[in-house]
Amino acid sequence: MLSLEEGYGIQLAPNSISILNKIGFRNIDKNHFFNPLKLNFYSNNNKICDLDLGKFNNDSIKYTTLQRSTLIEFLKDKLFTNNFRFGKEVRKVSKIQDKLLINFSDNTNDLVDFIIVSDGVFSKTKSIIESKDIKPRYNGSVAIRSVIKFSEEFNYESKNISLIMLPNAHIVIYPINKKGYFNLVCIVREKLSQNYDINSIIKKKILSKNKNLENLFKADLNLWPVYVSKKPIKSIHDNVFYLGDAFYTFVPALAQGASQSIEAAYELFNLLYENKKNIQNLYFTKRLKRIKQINKRSKFNYFGFHISNPLLMNLRNFILKRFVINKNFIQSYLGKIYK
């Protein structure tokens, strides 16, 4: 069995792979990642159509799926682990002329030129720096995750991504390595609760719609409420930058969370390296434009994946069949994001 401590899967589109390749990503062990060929769309148990992911690839930059731990270990090796100090908690940040003084909870201090905050959707550091309580918004859904092993009971194409659309839910399955392991994430509309019953949710919201999906949920399962950002925030300090989910967390329907973190980090690196003036405004303006572009598509996908009205489901399926083969639409809708 695969230990869940090794991490669930992530999808990296070509827009982030092109950046990672600059620090040697193409040289990692080929058994530790996968390059899916297609995205298969299913309405309940019936395959509707597929999207050729090769449209966004070239010989060295390909749509990639892998475990989070594989990416984290690669980045730690490439970004000088010995220069990082882990387990630090920011207690206070003060401006001293053009620098920032960080007071940590262990009573140590650091005087720095810049602070880059990337501590997730529930960023405590952001609230401390901005001197106000900044909270995300519950999205009205939960994410159920698992890592599953290929077996004869696996009814989906092992070399591709499968997107199964159900009333008020969707499931995504994809290979995370070449050892026969797959990431499963199920997004289900559900009221916020202090005590979720995973098996009850699966039975009522998934298996009641499609009993054939039962085999997907036999491994260890974990559940998280899905939170999204209310709006991006520009810091009160010119030399503080927010990155990843600390900057903005999307609705989980476009698989761009990790890719946008990488993309934003590269943008910020270039601005700092080139010693640009007014860096914060340049960074925030470009990120805000990108966020709006992706957020609009994510929300639209989320709505489309969860349609429950039978007539609208048929219409969605009809449109999907035509859109996936329309080169102009694919380039406009996904090409601008993935390339």
Regions found by a protein language model. Name each.
Residues M1-Y8:
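Glycine-rich FAD pyrophosphate-binding loop
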Residues A13-I129, I134-V147, R189-N199:
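Conserved N-terminal helical subregion
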Residues N35, G87, I96, P167, ...:
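Structural motif
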Residues C49-I72, E152-L223:
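Conserved FAD/dinucleotide-binding core of flavoprotein oxidoreductases
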Residues L111, Y181, D238-N239:
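Conserved catalytic motifs of the protein kinase core domain
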Residues I116-V117, D220-F305:
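Conserved mid-domain beta->alpha element of the FAD-binding
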Residues F122-S123, A143-R145, A169-V172, F247-Y248:
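Histidine-centered metal-chelating micro-motifs
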Residues N317-K339:
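C-terminal auxiliary extensions adjacent to catalytic cores
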